[in-house]
Structures are given as structure tokens and as C-alpha cells.
Amino acid sequence: MSKLTTGSFSIEDLESVQITINNIVGAAKEAAEKAEEELGPMGPTPFPTAATVRDWSFTLFDRYEPVYTPMCDQCCYCTFGPCNLEGNRRGACGLDMKGQAAREFFLRCITGCACHSAHGRHLLDHIISIFGEDMPINMGASNVIAPNIQLITGRQPKTLGDLKPIMEYVEEELGQLLATVHAGQEGAAIDYDNKAMLAGILDHVGMEVSDIAQVTALGFPKSDPEAPLVEVGMGTLDASKPVIIAIGHNVAGVTYIMDYMEDNNLTDKMEIGGLCCTAFDMTRYKREDRKPPYAKIVGTISKELKVVRSGIPDVIVIDEQCVRADLVEEGKKLKIPVIASNEKVMYGLPDRTNDDVDAIIEDIKTGKIPGCVMLDYEKLGELVPRLAMEMAPLREGISAIPSDEEMASLVAKCVACGECALACPEELDIPDAIQAAKEGDFTALDFLHDLCVGCRRCEQVCNKEIPILSVIDKAAQKAIAEEKGLVRAGRGQVSDAEIRAEGLNLVMGTTPGVIAIIGCANYPAGSKDVYRIAEEFLNRNYIVAVSGCSAMDIGMYKDADGKTLYERFPGRFERGNILNTGSCVSNSHISGTCHKVAAIFAGRNLSGNLAEIADYTLNRVGAVGLAWGAYSQKAAAIGTGCNMYGIPAVLGPHSGKYRRALIAKTYDENKWKVYDSRNGSELDIPPSPEFLITTAETWQEACVLLAKNCIRPSDNNMGRSIKLTHWIELSEKYLGVLPEDWWKFVRHEADLPLSRREELLKKLETEHGWEIDWKKKKIISGPKIKFDVSSQPTNLKRLCKEA
């Protein structure tokens, strides 16, 4: 082949020369026209930045004002400090307390977004390296396959390679956002809040990339309401076999371990279980054919230390996110090797990626090293099962759980100083439980097992060096052995067909709402609360969507017939169903479902059209999120993204530590007005949702908030009556009172709960001065909100026809 050389030429003296680049221009134009034909016209904010989302953020903040809850009065960001910001003081840089609290919250959101998005980048690059960029995306029977991506970027990816520019956009924006955290940058709290909202929606894009990649390539269930049931709980593990425990959120490396087990007929000779979201994705791997998984879900982050100290694992393999920082130290005590398979968590372990597997096993067996980093997944797949089989006989009988004699000795050391109770984030009465144990009564310690979040803070302040967590688990051995439940493997997206079938009911209110129970396991009073909440709303015909750690814990409890909620209720997107979308990154499918309602049911243009779709959701789709045990920065990002999308969220009491809420003033009538897009006239609406993000103190209070904030301006009479019925009943059942503002939601007598119509009409007349025609049992005058089922509520003036 001849070698090409560079050169130049001039057309200065040439006549009648035409240079055409029509193939390039024409191709680009053709692609743009095809995209518009498929996806509709491009909206106003494709690939948004902090500047282009600001108008919508500020529209939300005008009603839902930021409320800041700082953890301390100081700022320690730079060497000018620390600066005391109490009493409206400003720091050396000029930032005040509001700005600092907003910056802290924003920092948590971009941290969470970076975590999910880096997960997505790693997973996408890994999967493309195996299957190629041209692998078609397959999410099941849907045309709207990437609603978050389409909404935010205006693009609809067709192949894995199409996801790469999406990730590049997220990464670029994260860099721009992170820069504003630096001292001497943003100075206004409200603009930090706007940037947090952008970080939230970027998080949903990053999560969607992650799950699209793994659902497409790894044989996960695809929009499958009958995904297989999976065993969950510590009691599901057969400790007589070698046991592998995987911890984290990125399943890429674990799939190689499972492949090795299958290829070598080891699936019935050893156990593999997981903690946190890797556990969910292990049970989804190669399960689109609905075969029962052999992998087991052991539990949530709160179970990590409990599982390690049980001595059950023979090898721990970790990837990224929600893994304890002390696993190597805890593992050393029990001769449990730790294998790190992702460079985000390397624990100071030696990198043995390039070494021979036999040599690594020998070094770990002999105690030369406590584990290693292994980034070659082919070797990882071989190393971990072989190591587990080698370590199991060497570790037989090793556990941190005390014997009966050791237990008596340990509890006898307690002097009831109360330091452990003061350190406990759940304020558990550990001293009294240990005092009872001294007398031989272990009931109170056993009771603490489910309430304990496994943080070990109590042990670190104990002057007698009692391993309190191990003492609690010793008392709960029977409960732990019986800890066996069932959870449905993650089904993936909600299909377009399900949206078409349920969209009208949801928008009109005859399906009372969607309750999305997501997030971590930092519960204020044990894991059963999320089960109670889910059961309450399923019995009331709400759609309950779940994911992550909450989905696991919901599956741990059974009714009198021994059935879990996943066995009692179907898994479709329709009223009275519970659908588990999957791991943490599958939360994008829950927000994406709301976008799909607007796009498929209402025919709204999705592409690059953030404000219009979020406005539709806020005014018409009765969806509320619940992150009852939220602890992480990822949870903050997920919730904030939902807020930007018009979806309110209730958090548990610990979440005040996030430092910011978005709460409306329900008494300010000027805040509860929207436009009727038919003609631009002003409409009064009820004060709901009354917040975008807030906290509740108890699960009972949370139930009432969830029901109330499913009410939407678009509800028809039947829908409003159904929603008022549930809200009023829950308030009376759990709080013992009729809601004080129930009357504000009545537009017409047909809105009233049918069984209590006469009673409530009397209250409207005697307590609120409304005029009632008692012969016809009709409201003559009183309501400020007029009922018009054909009204089109919107917060956006530009959507009105006159505009």
C-alpha cells in the first residue's frame, strides 16, 4: 500500500469550482428530521445546565421555600476559618449560614450523583468492552426505553454506544457543579439549591444509564411483573457449605464468580449471597427466563457487620458503595479474607491483579495477606470460589458470637454507665437490656436486634470494652436463624402497555396514588415500619413501587398465613400491586414511570422538555416517595431529582441531618394558584403537595402525609372522594384526629367520602359557614376552589393557549 503524504493546494486561480459537503450536511439534517419524527419536536432544555434549569427551579422555590437545618454554626472550608456563622454573621468569604447550609446539601447531592454516575460509567465501559457499542438496547416491550435520558437530553438511545455521550454530558456537568463548592464561588443559597436540583436530575440520568446497560447485556428481567421470587435473610444461608458474601452495588465482577460456579457445577456445593444492591443484581443475572435464582439476598447495609461477626462468610468480595470501611479489620479477627474488585474501594490491600491465582490463594491461606485487590474479572471469577472452598475447612467454628459462658461474663462487666445509649443513633436502651440479661432474661436484647442499625458506635464508647453488637446478636440467635423471607427480583422498567392501562386512573385519581418506598436502612424504629406502610397502602389499592434496601426489608415479614407481601400481591403497575424495580439504580424507572404517564397517556412531548413534564407530574400524577431510612448522599440525590420532577418525598426523622427541606406555606392562598392552559385564566388549587421534601417522626405520621400528598388539582370527583377517604381514615386511625384542613380540598359535594357525606356536610355548615341544601344534600356556596374536570392546571404561563 502506498504511503499517504500531506500537502496543500490553492483554488485561487480556478474558475467555476464547486465544493460540496452535501453528504455530511444532508446526513445530519436527515438524522435530525428522523429524530423529530420519532421523538417529537425538541423541547427548550436539551442537555440542561444550572442556568437553563433555573427558571423551573425558581418556580418550585416560589411555592416550596427552602428550610435549612444546619448541623453546626461553623464553616471549616478554608484556611480563613473556622468561621462562626451564628446570629446572621457572615464568614471571611462573605457566605452566611443559609448559603453554607445550602452548599452542604448541594455537596451531598453531587456526591450521590457522582457515585451513581461513576458506577454507570464503569459498568457501561465494561459491558461495551465485552458486547460492543452496537449491541441494541433491550428494556422489554416498550418504545419509551429511556425516559429520563430523553427528557433531560432529548435523545433516545438505541445501542449501548449511544449511552456514551449521555455519560459524557453528566460527567461534564458534575465537574461544573463541583467547581461551585470551592470557597469564593456561589454566594446565594437559592442558587446552591438550584444546582442541587440539577444534580438530582443528573443522578436519575446516571442511574438510568447503569440499569439500561446491565438489563440489556446481563440477562436481567425486562419489564417483567412476574420476575422470580428470591430468598432473603440471614437464615437462608446454609453455613455447612463454603459461603461467599458479596457487598456493594456494582455487580460487574460478581457475574464472573457466578459464571465460574455454574461452569464448574458449584451452585449446589457452595452458597453465594449478597448485601445491599449487588445482592439484588446477583439475583437478576440471567433470570429473564424466570428461573429461580440460586444467589440469595442476605440483607441491607445495617446487616453487614452482623453477617461478618456471625462467622458465616468464608470470603467477602466487595465492589463499591455502601460497604463498611472496617471490613478488612473485622475480617482479620475471624480469618475471613476480603477481595476488593473495584478501584473505588481498595482498603490498602495489595494489588494482585497480575499474579497467579494459585499464588494468591496460598498467600491468603497462610495468613501472609488478609485479602487483595483483584481487578481482572476473569481471575476474580476463579479466585473467589476456589478461595471459599479452601478457607471453609480452615475457618470451621470461628465466629465472633460469644458462647454461653462468654456471654454471662460479658454482660456481668456492664456497670450501666449509659454511654452506649448516648452514642446510639437510635437511642436504644442498651443498659437496661444488659441488666436484664445479667438476671438471665435475654428478651430485651433479642428485641434490640431488629432496631439496631449495626453501626457499632456503642462499642466504641464502652469503658468495659464489651462487644455490644455481638452480645445483641447472641441473644437473637433464634431470630436470626428464622430470618427467612421472599422478595421479588427486580422487574426493571414499567412497560408502555402498563402505562396505557393505568394512566387515566392515576391522573383522574381513581387509582389513589403511587407510593414509592425506596432508600436505605437507617430506620428510626426497626425495619418492620416499611412493611407496615407498604401493607397499609396495598390494602387501600394504591400502587406501591419499591427498590433497594427497603424492598429487601419489606420481604422479611409475613402475615398470619406465612406469606410475604410479594406473595400476596401481584407485581404489575396497577392499583393494589407491589412492584420491585430492582437495585438502587433502578430508582430511575420509578421517576421514569411518571414521565411515561405524561408522554404515553397525555401525549406530551418528552424530548428536552423538563419543565413541562415536571409541571404535568406536579399537577396531575399522584405520586409520593418515601425514603424512610435514608442515610446516604445517593439518597439525597435521588430525592432531590424527584423534587425537580414534581414528585414530593417524605423522609425519616434522621434525614433532618441533610440540612434542607422544601416546604410550602399552606395558609398563603397566593401560593396555591395556577394557570388554566386552555385560556390562561387563574385557578385556585388545594394545598397539595404541601412539600417537595420533608421529614416525619413516626411511620404513622408518614402514612398520613403520604395519603394527603397524593391529592392533585386534576382529580375528578370520584378520585378526590377516594383520596379524601384514605387521608381522613389514616389520620383518624393513626393520629386520632380529623385533619384540620380537610375542608380546603372539597370543591363539590361529590368530592366527599360517600359513607360520611352527611356528617362532613354538617361540619362544613357549622364550622366553616358553608351553605348547604339539605333536601338535595348539595353545597350551595362555600368552596373557594371551583370544580371543572376539563381544566388544565399548569404553573407555566408559556403553555397557555393565549401565550
Swiss-Prot record:
Pathway: One-carbon metabolism; methanogenesis from acetate. CO binds at residue 116. Its EC number is 1.2.7.4. GO terms for biological process: acetyl-CoA metabolic process; methanogenesis, from acetate; response to hydrogen peroxide. Binds 7 [4Fe-4S] clusters per heterotetramer. Binds 2 [Ni-4Fe-4S] clusters per heterotetramer. Pfam families: Fer4_7 (PF12838), Prismane (PF03063). Residues 405-433, 443-472 form the 4Fe-4S ferredoxin-type domain. [4Fe-4S] cluster 1 binds at residues 72, 76. InterPro entries: 4Fe4S_Fe-S-bd (IPR017896), 4Fe4S_Fe_S_CS (IPR017900), CdhA (IPR004460), HCP/CODH (IPR004137), Prismane-like_a/b-sand (IPR016099), Prismane-like_sf (IPR011254). The keyword Protein biosynthesis does not apply. It comes from the Archaea. GO terms for molecular function: 4 iron, 4 sulfur cluster binding; anaerobic carbon-monoxide dehydrogenase activity; hydroxylamine reductase activity; iron ion binding; nickel cation binding; peroxidase activity. [4Fe-4S] cluster 2 binds at residues 75, 78, 83, 93. [4Fe-4S] cluster 4 binds at residues 424, 452, 455, 458. Its cofactor is [4Fe-4S] cluster; [Ni-4Fe-4S] cluster. [Ni-4Fe-4S] cluster binds at residues 249, 277, 322, 520, 549, 584. Cluster B is an all-cysteinyl-liganded 4Fe-4S cluster; cluster C is a mixed Ni-Fe-S cluster which is the active site of CO oxidation. Cluster D is also an all-cysteinyl-liganded 4Fe-4S cluster that bridges the two subunits of the CODH dimer. Contains two additional 4Fe-4S clusters, dubbed E and F, that probably transport electrons from ferredoxin to the B cluster. Belongs to the Ni-containing carbon monoxide dehydrogenase family. This is Acetyl-CoA decarbonylase/synthase complex subunit alpha 2. The gene is cdhA2.
